[in-house]
């Protein structure tokens, strides 16, 4: 018998390390490039992105950019125009991520803290909820632990910190019950710096009705189709890991609709014997005692709103979600 723990992380750990992996960092890089030889479609896209930053509802996260690209498809008359703009954005993003991936990490990084955080994510919960998780974990008190990280980031930062090669396993700290805990190779569901994937969850997010059903368009900008064409089984592995997870930890993720496939899977998993710890971050959130339940409800409802669960199922699932707000999780310097 084994216990399966899954971590789904995006970019907060990289931001904590001072790495410029946010959309706004790429935005400045992309619009700062020489545009004199750009095609008409690329120039129009850059102008759109520039104007977007002046809007109150401007893109803040990578998922906002992805949804925005789906909306922007109404500006294309044919597949060729779409590919011109999309491929330039994707190629420049690849260039940018390669630059970030080559940067030296801070010498002060505490790799042992990363190992502890991966081993005991429940340490950041309040005592009552920590006890509830402990009692839940007792079911696997004699089991070996398997830990998987699904990274939505393109860089190899985690591998560098942990000093592991691409296909290496490593031993984390023993479980709270003294059994082994193995971290398996990190899975990059959106690809890595040599072939980053950026796009949509499904065809309904393509707002150009004339291009929506076009097979080439779908294969260009729908992430599940891109993973399917790559035939690397990464998507199959992530699907299987979520379906068998006993504990899922979400850290640093904007819960964007362009990854709705995975939120739906987690919603389905919550119908079973599984728990989720959602590490939310909002420095503007005041942790007044009288507001704690409101805050928990807000983040639980946000996560559940991304699933396809019925209202009755959401009510049941809510009791299986734990919110950890503004913690020191993965603060390594």
Give the ranges of each region predicted by the language model:
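Acidic, metal/cofactor-coordinating or nucleic-acid-engaging core segments within structured domains
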Residues: 197-243, 287, 291-304
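SIR2/sirtuin-family catalytic core signature
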Residues: 236-333
């Amino acid at each position: 018998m084994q216990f399966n723990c899954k971590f789904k992380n995006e970019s907060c750990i990289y931001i904590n390390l001072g790495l410029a992996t946010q959309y706004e960092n790429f935005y400045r890089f992309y619009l700062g490039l020489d545009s004199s030889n750009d095609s008409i479609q690329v120039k129009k896209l850059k102008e759109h992105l520039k104007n977007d930053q002046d809007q109150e509802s401007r893109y803040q996260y990578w998922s906002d950019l992805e949804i925005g690209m789906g909306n922007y498809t109404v500006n294309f008359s044919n597949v060729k125009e779409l590919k011109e703009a999309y491929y330039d954005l994707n190629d420049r993003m690849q260039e940018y991520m390669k630059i970030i991936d080559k940067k030296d990490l801070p010498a002060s990084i505490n790799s042992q803290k990363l190992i502890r955080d991966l081993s005991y994510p429940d340490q950041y919960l309040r005592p009552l909820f920590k006890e509830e998780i402990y009692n839940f974990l007792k079911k696997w008190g004699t089991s070996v632990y398997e830990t998987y990280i699904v990274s939505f980031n393109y860089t190899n930062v985690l591998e560098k910190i942990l000093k592991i090669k691409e296909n290496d396993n490593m031993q984390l700290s023993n479980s709270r019950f003294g059994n082994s805990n193995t971290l398996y190779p990190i899975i990059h569901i959106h690809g890595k710096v040599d072939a980053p994937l950026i796009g949509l969850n499904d065809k309904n997010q393509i707002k150009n009705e004339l291009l929506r059903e076009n097979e080439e368009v779908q294969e260009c900008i729908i992430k599940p189709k891109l993973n399917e064409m790559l035939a690397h089984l990464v998507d199959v592995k992530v699907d299987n890991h979520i379906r068998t997870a006993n504990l899922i930890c979400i850290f640093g993720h904007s819960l964007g609709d362009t990854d709705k496939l995975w939120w739906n899977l987690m919603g389905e998993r919550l119908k079973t014997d599984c728990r989720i710890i959602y590490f939310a971050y909002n420095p503007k959130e005041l942790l007044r005692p009288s507001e704690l339940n409101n805050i928990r409800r807000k983040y639980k409802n946000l996560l559940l709103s991304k699933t396809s669960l019925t209202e009755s199922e959401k009510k049941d699932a809510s009791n299986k979600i734990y919110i950890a707000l503004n913690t020191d999780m993965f603060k390594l310097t």
